[in-house]
Amino acid sequence: MTIKPVSQERLPELLRTIPKAELHIHIEGSLEPELMFALAQRNGVSIPYPDVASLRAAYVFDNLQSFLDIYHAGTLVLRTEQDFYDMTHAYLARAAADNVLHAEIFFDPQTHTAHGVSADVVINGLYRACVDARVEFDMNASLILCFLRHLSEQEAFECLEQALPHLDKLVGVGLASSEMGHPPEKFARVFARARELGLRLVAHAGEEGPPAYIWSALDVLKVERIDHGVQAVQDPLLMARLARDRIALTVCPLSNLKLRVFPTLAAHNLGRLLEAGIVATVNSDDPSYFGGYINQNFTQTFAALGLTAQHAYQLAHNSFEASFIDDRLKRQYFDRLAGVFETFE
């Protein structure tokens, strides 16, 4: 579809208006300090910050591991099914306001089972919020269980076993947490089992890790989509493979900036990925920690890189193409997207 030009003044409004899917959102990373405090009080959990302001000030980190440390500390307040419902509902309300029509939500049950919270409690709370979003926000949402790669293969198998009663509530599995020193092939057998169970497969690769991790995720884990993947540009053969096979990258620009994957947003390679014909998408990753939900990722990245309305259409189209929804719903979303561009002035 050829897109008519939109002025720089009107472009932010277009970016806010376009329908889109979000495919890389860790629900625990959407926990805002205000809700964290409320849940801590509700559950009698002590947190080492006297007020919301001091907690916000603690959201300062310069690499993936230091972020993960505060991220996991924040999850201690999540104890009941209602807590997980409230957190997910808050994200879905915010996403709906950003014109997200479909979200595929990551969650990591191992974080919570380590705190004595059962996988049943986690999944039921998340799923109930997704079901309610269909009526309340006219929004589709599904769940992707993420294994934590710094833990063992055996622990990942145990996590999958605990989720078996809830397979109907899950669309897929993923692989998250600190990448360095934890190559994808560590989890080859777990992903093979998940595939046998009919789950879709994705994995974080090539965020801080090398292009070799992306190759492994594709060829050993057999994933259908790569989360992050920005290091692919180091490998021309990999770039060609991603473009040829329409393998999507769920890119998270503000996350990359916050974790210093790129020194500035202007140095980000999103534009280069699109020019190479790769199915790149824009996502928020852990929005409460990285300073931006999906529309802030769009508006700030477009401003920094000088991207255009044509790029906006391509990224939104890519997000629906790369999603795990059925073809009928994809066509509906493609039509809605085209309609916005046809009528936007």
Curated annotation (Swiss-Prot):
**Residues annotated as site: Important for catalytic activity:** H228
Identify the residues that bind substrate. Answer: D286
For this protein, what does the record note about how its cofactor is bound? Binds 1 zinc ion per subunit.
What does the UniProt keyword field contain?
Hydrolase, Metal-binding, Nucleotide metabolism, Zinc
- Residues the entry annotates as binding Zn(2+): H24, H26, H204, D285
GO molecular function annotations of the record: adenine deaminase activity; zinc ion binding
List the cofactors.
Zn(2+)
Q: Name one GO cellular component term.
A: cytosol
Q: Which residues form the active site?
A: E207
Q: Catalyses which reaction?
A: adenine + H2O + H(+) = hypoxanthine + NH4(+)
Record keyword Metal-binding present: yes
Q: Which InterPro entries match?
A: A_deaminase_dom, ADE, Ado/ade_deaminase, Metal_Hydrolase
Q: Which Pfam families match?
A: A_deaminase
Question: EC number(s)?
Answer: 3.5.4.2
Q: Which Gene3D superfamilies match?
A: Metal-dependent hydrolases
Q: Which GO terms describe its biological process?
A: adenine catabolic process; hypoxanthine salvage; nucleotide metabolic process
The EC category is: hydrolase
Q: Which family does it belong to?
A: Belongs to the metallo-dependent hydrolases superfamily. Adenosine and AMP deaminases family. Adenine deaminase type 2 subfamily.
Q: What does this protein do?
A: Catalyzes the hydrolytic deamination of adenine to hypoxanthine. Plays an important role in the purine salvage pathway and in nitrogen catabolism.
Name of the featured protein: Adenine deaminase
Please report the organism this UniProt entry assigns to the protein. Answer: Albidiferax ferrireducens (strain ATCC BAA-621 / DSM 15236 / T118) (Rhodoferax ferrireducens)
